[in-house]
Amino acid sequence: MERFPDYINVTMPSHFYPDDGKWIQEMLAKLRVSTRAKITGEYSEVYQAAWDEEPVSYRKDNAARRAANIRLREFVVEYQEAAQGYTAKPIAVNQP
């Protein structure tokens, strides 16, 4: 468990690229504690799956980082909007 500067405990995923550590902590700190645990597990799963799927050894790190980081970034953006009350505009239904 690592210490984030504002004294929030951020548990890091079991699989991640060390250079991404600070960014991952920043993203996870934006989430609720209950959500963080699930997302760190899923981050590790996506990272490991992308690592295993890449056949070229020197491309494994990049493929794994890219897949896991894109997923984390997209989730955090959508989660923050939902947590702040933003919703999509309802679909208009034609009334006869």
Please provide the spans of the model-predicted regions.
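C-terminal alpha-helical interaction appendages
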Residues: 1-96
